[in-house]
A protein has these predicted regions:
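Surface-exposed beta-loop-beta
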Residues: 39, 51, 67-92, 98
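Conserved beta-propeller blade repeats
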Residues: 1-10, 41-60, 88-116, 142, ...
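Helix-coil-helix junctions within alpha-helical repeat/solenoid scaffolds
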Residues: 116-118, 124-141, 146-149
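Polar, glycine-rich mid-to-C-terminal structural blocks
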Residues: 19-62, 71
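Secondary-structure transition/capping motifs at alpha-helix termini
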Residues: 1, 28, 75-78, 102-108, ...
């Protein structure tokens, strides 16, 4: 943690797969460490880190086709991790946390989450969630969609936009919800 009072670390199983997260209070015996998360599904690996804005401790779990992010506010390191967005089979997502300090209408902070996911489009989309609206868990597709990948050339592209799979190679593709760059 940024205050140097707590250390979170992963445990490895016999196959060197990170599968559990432990919490250690600096200055106490390792025997007092507490398991805060265990991944039972052997297809998933586990990682732990601090969010970019240093406001959350983040556990990331992932298999080849499915991911999940759990979070815990850094000011409550003895609390319980919560899924940011609950795990959904064959859906990948990642979250970056940011905070515009003092940028609210009355000087309050504006915590945001930038979510990159493939729930609605095989080539992913990016949503921004204003975390002032409610506590997690959030749902995939919540927030403001700011960019969408092209479904062109994807195995399931026609599920997103009918006819896109039959477009000739080299055909320009533009999605009106993407910003002009």
């Amino acid at each position: 943690t940024p205050d140097a009072q707590w250390v979170f670390y992963v445990l490895l199983d016999g196959a060197w797969r990170p599968y559990a997260v432990m919490r250690h209070r600096v200055g106490t015996p390792v025997t007092d460490d507490v398991e805060v998360y265990r991944e039972a599904d052997e297809r998933f690996w586990v990682g732990i880190g601090l969010s970019f804005d240093e406001r959350n401790i983040v556990i990331g779990t992932g298999s080849k086709t499915t991911t999940e992010v759990l979070m815990l506010p850094v000011d409550t390191p003895e609390g319980s991790f919560r899924a940011f967005i609950p795990r959904e089979t064959d859906v990948e997502y990642d979250v970056s946390f940011a905070c515009f300090e003092g940028a609210g209408e009355h000087g309050e902070d504006i915590p945001l989450a930038v979510v990159y996911h493939n729930a609605l489009n095989p080539n992913f989309e990016i949503d921004v969630i204003d975390m002032r609206t409610h506590e997690p868990p959030y749902r995939l597709g919540e927030g403001v969609r700011v960019a969408v990948g092209s479904p062109y050339g994807c195995e399931h592209g026609d599920d997103v936009e009918p006819g896109v799979s039959s477009m000739p190679i080299g055909t320009p593709y533009s999605n009106p919800c993407n910003p002009a760059i």
